[in-house]
């Protein structure tokens, strides 16, 4: 149980703090319209991730008798985590483009997240295999994983919206870089676990 909760927290924090289109939109909406609009953008994954999560998990459950497929998916997930960890350790901050359009923050956030490849790759290669592994132990394990992941993802982006509303320099300062490097190291640890699970399924 603790392992699934820990995985959800670590991956959620990474997804929340890492530079990308959604975080850039959170910051730009905050700068233009205030923290409240940035928080609205941050809430978008609650709506957009659930359909991706359900489809990915349902598909892999139907293929669960084919352990080789799950093994390959898990190894691909581990490689994706290594890629994310590298990007996290080497991060240089967040680039933000400012325009003067109306807020429409939640809608913009939902569109940006739905059109980004990252949620699809994450849930297919990392999220869904973790949920299926959790279901083998208890129905509570996947709920802990998904709940902690989305809670930390949305919560950290909301926190960044509030911080950006008070200090626009945080996302280019040392504390942010240290956070991202620490999260990168944690991701490498989870990549090792996922890779080991993949090899076990291939046997």
Where are these predicted regions, by residue range?
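Helical-face signature of the major facilitator-like transporter fold
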Residues: 8, 12, 105, 109, ...
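Juxtamembrane cytosolic amphipathic helices that cap and anchor the N-termini
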Residues: 3, 104-105, 117
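Juxtamembrane transmembrane-helix termini in multi-pass membrane transport proteins
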Residues: 2-71, 125-144
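Selected transmembrane alpha-helices and immediately adjacent juxtamembrane segments
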Residues: 108-126
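Hydrophobic/aromatic residues within the transmembrane alpha-helices of Major Facilitator Superfamily
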Residues: 9, 13, 17, 50, ...
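Selective transmembrane alpha-helices of multi-pass membrane proteins
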Residues: 66-93, 150-156, 160, 171-203
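Membrane helix-loop-helix hairpins that form the core translocation module of multi-pass transporters
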Residues: 35-108, 163-166
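Hydrophobic/aromatic residues in alpha-helical transmembrane segments
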Residues: 22-26, 85, 123-127, 147, ...
């Amino acid at each position: 149980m603790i392992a699934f909760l820990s995985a959800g927290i670590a991956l959620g924090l990474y997804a929340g703090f890492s530079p990308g289109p959604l975080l850039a939109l959170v910051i730009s909406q905050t700068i233009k319209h205030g923290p409240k609009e940035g928080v609205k953008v941050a809430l978008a994954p609650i709506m957009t991730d659930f359909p991706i999560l359900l489809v990915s998990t349902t598909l892999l459950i139907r293929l669960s008798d084919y352990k080789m497929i799950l093994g390959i998916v898990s190894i691909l997930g581990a490689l994706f985590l290594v890629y994310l960890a590298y990007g996290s350790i080497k991060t240089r901050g967040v680039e933000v483009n400012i325009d003067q359009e109306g807020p429409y923050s939640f809608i913009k956030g939902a569109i940006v997240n739905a059109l980004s490849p990252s949620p699809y790759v994450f849930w297919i290669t990392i999220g869904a295999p973790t949920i299926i592994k959790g279901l083998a132990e208890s129905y509570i394990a996947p709920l802990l994983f998904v709940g902690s992941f989305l809670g930390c993802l949305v919560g950290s982006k909301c926190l960044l919206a509030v911080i950006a509303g008070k200090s626009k320099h945080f996302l280019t300062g040392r504390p942010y870089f240290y956070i991202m490097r620490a999260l990168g190291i944690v991701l490498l640890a989870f990549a090792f676990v996922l890779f080991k699970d993949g090899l076990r399924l291939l046997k």
